[in-house]
Amino acid sequence: MSTMRLLTLALLFSCSFARAACDPKIVNIGAVLSTRKHEQMFREAVNQANKRHGSWKIQLNATSVTHKPNAIQMALSVCEDLISSQVYAILVSHPPTPNDHFTPTPVSYTAGFYRIPVLGLTTRMSIYSDKSIHLSFLRTVPPYSHQSSVWFEMMRVYSWNHIILLVSDDHEGRAAQKRLETLLEERESKSKKRNYENLDQLSYDHKRGPKAEKVLQFDPGTKNVTALLMEARELEARVIILSASEDDAATVYRAAAMLNMTGSGYVWLVGEREISGNALRYAPDGIIGLQLINGKNESAHISDAVGVVAQAVHELLEKENITDPPRGCVGNTNIWKTGPLFKRVLMSSKYADGVTGRVEFNEDGDRKFANYSIMNLQNRKLVQVGIYNGTHVIPNDRKIIWPGGETEKPRGYQMSTRLKIVTIHQEPFVYVKPTLSDGTCKEEFTVNGDPVKKVICTGPNDTSPGSPRHTVPQCCYGFCIDLLIKLARTMNFTYEVHLVADGKFGTQERVNNSNKKEWNGMMGELLSGQADMIVAPLTINNERAQYIEFSKPFKYQGLTILVKKEIPRSTLDSFMQPFQSTLWLLVGLSVHVVAVMLYLLDRFSPFGRFKVNSEEEEEDALTLSSAMWFSWGVLLNSGIGEGAPRSFSARILGMVWAGFAMIIVASYTANLAAFLVLDRPEERITGINDPRLRNPSDKFIYATVKQSSVDIYFRRQVELSTMYRHMEKHNYESAAEAIQAVRDNKLHAFIWDSAVLEFEASQKCDLVTTGELFFRSGFGIGMRKDSPWKQNVSLSILKSHENGFMEDLDKTWVRYQECDSRSNAPATLTFENMAGVFMLVAGGIVAGIFLIFIEIAYKRHKDARRKQMQLAFAAVNVWRKNLQDRKSGRAEPDPKKKATFRAITSTLASSFKRRRSSKDTQYHPTDITGTLNLSDPSVSTVV
């Protein structure tokens, strides 16, 4: 008996313990719903979730309330009816009244304070995506701002690249604007990764994403948006995207109808609010709107939200030890520690079997991959004409009726026929001259005799840095202006031309030393909307092509180097330039060596003396002076009148010398013409790889233009970094300044576009281009991205190439060669070339005059010596005769003869005495009074 009792007690205890161990964990889920009917649906959805998961460990329990009339009552109800039940999550639907935005807010604030996750069911307002305000809010529907993804995809499908974004200046409008701009920027960043290498192809396309031409905002509740819509009407875009409340949308529709902006050519893309309620009454036919599929189906969202919570609860309880949620709000300020973890599990959930489709959340807790119906208002009724499946738009174009009753897709833009053209002063492509006093342009003619086509262009009268700038009307003409006139006539548009304000082509520069970069020059004006088109010698490069559209190149070119031409200067010794000084010395030495050899050969040869017969005396052999005269005469090809060598050996040498002289003279004559007439090739730059460029020094300065495509090219090329560092210190503000610096010898080399430099070299004969072209590219017309004119401009340029118009422009403006015509003229010698020869003749005359005086002086001196010797011989003879007479015993000499002898001896004695006293004085025989009387009979007799 006692044993039976013990067994019974043991069985009872074991059963009680087993029941305690088998009881599932109760997980309460709260809900704030619209009606009692939806509360019943909520309980059924919870029961279905329990059955679906079939877990004996977890049991979901439904706790719900309905909406309260105000926020305070709603917050109290959440605390008293839901949080007090220790709910793990709260589901909340949007209030049934469309203008009541407060009911989800108190639920989100109250539950968020304790970090209890809140799942919105039909709440679409974008404010709930802000996690700094709504900490624990998730939702199974996307916000209104996510409609921007559908608009963006429709723009891509229909190739609408020009849009106007019209938004209300509230949180909803700003959120839609921000999301759309983010999508546009993402597409833009992807397109920038393209490699634009084949710029020569017309098919190099820029399939960019759409871009908002303008964003127009208006205050919520405004009653007059006419001025705003008039501004939109002046733009090119005809695709208008509207994000506004129902009442604001109705205001916009009424104003648009009055401005005739709802007819043919326009496209209106709107969201769900803009085709609901009061807005639908004023919406124009043809408008395209969106409707979220199951967006207002509260029952479907209840089922999906419960399924997501149930899946997350099971996942959380199986992996983590969780704490219990807070019980009530009174006196409880502690947050639920497991709440943030549970929220992360919910956000990472992927519920594939939802009634509304696949349920996933993004980082803001908003629904991803929502499906939309694309609606078209036709005859005041909304007709579905396509769907958005979460990633792509699938339209049914045959069912769409566009504004104005059109069935063909509008192109989405209107082409303005009045274009603002920006250009830059760059000869020969654009000349800039002041206007006449009456405001007109001076009439001029081209080299072909045709009148020059000029247009009025406004711009600064001086673009040099630091100078005052005044915008004045000026006259522009040249290659690009003729091209602009041709394009305007072909494509039927008008234009107004202005010069770029800062005088630059365009490059990116930092703003206020920040990381932000902006374009300057013509690029900046085009991107900022100050210009519609750039018609100038703008080089096509990758950096610019990422931001603007380029047409087909109208001029192909590259980079080259401009240097100053070394003009040869004729010197007095220019006639000696054909031979080096060493050769001249050898020739001179040869002349004298040959002369000496001729003299010696003729002197020592037995046949060096010549006589006709034996009775005649032999002629003297060749003297040294005659040999010199012969040697020089043969060399200078002058006639030899006398003094020719007599011996056979000397004549052999003379013939060899004549051959030598012929070769020397012929070589000299040939080279003399080249040196006196033709330019000698100087040492120029060989190209970009020249050592003087690759190894820069302060002795050789080269540069380009600041903030130009050439500057960008050298900055981007790593292998040219050394050159760029040298150039950066010497770059000029404009090409004209740099070219003038080359002419003034302030700059040794200027690197720039070949078309410009070759033109300058052809017009300024002291300049020359050198080296081969490098960095080949082309000049193109610049337009904003996806400009409606791009294709037409490129086609027109292609036709101009085909029909020879571009060739004619080249001949008229670029290939006109002034210096070439001068260089092709026959070369003539000038006085400068032959001045040295005349100076040589003058030197010969001076030398001859100098030598004649020396000869005269020498002759007089020689004659005096000879006469002195004659007197001496006469005196000796007289003395000898007298001596003989004495020895023979003859009488005394005649007294007259004695007197004569005394006179002669006295004269000789005084002459020798004076000669010893002064060597430089010449003396002559004198008589007793100081003058020798040669007419004296006795003297003449003695002599």
Curated annotation (Swiss-Prot):
It comes from the Eukaryota. The chain crosses the membrane at residues 581-601, 652-668, 834-854. It is found in: Cell membrane; Postsynaptic cell membrane; Postsynaptic density membrane; Synaptic cell membrane. It is a multi-pass membrane protein. The keyword Cytoplasm does not apply. One of its GO terms (biological process) is regulation of membrane potential. GO terms for molecular function: glutamate-gated calcium ion channel activity; glycine binding; ligand-gated sodium channel activity; metal ion binding; NMDA glutamate receptor activity; signaling receptor activity. Residues 21-580, 669-833 are extracellular. Disulfide bonds join 79-329, 441-475, 457-476, 765-819. Keywords: Calcium, Cell membrane, Disulfide bond, Glycoprotein, Ion channel, Ion transport, Ligand-gated ion channel, Magnesium, Membrane, Metal-binding, Phosphoprotein, Postsynaptic cell membrane, Receptor, Signal, Synapse, Transmembrane, Transmembrane helix, Transport, Zinc. A hydrophobic region that gives rise to the prediction of a transmembrane span does not cross the membrane, but is part of a discontinuously helical region that dips into the membrane and is probably part of the pore and of the selectivity filter. The extracellular N-terminal domain (NTD) is a site of allosteric regulation to modulate overall receptor function. This is Glutamate receptor ionotropic, NMDA 1. It comes from Canis lupus familiaris (Dog). The lineage of its organism: Eukaryota, Metazoa, Chordata, Craniata, Vertebrata. The gene is GRIN1.
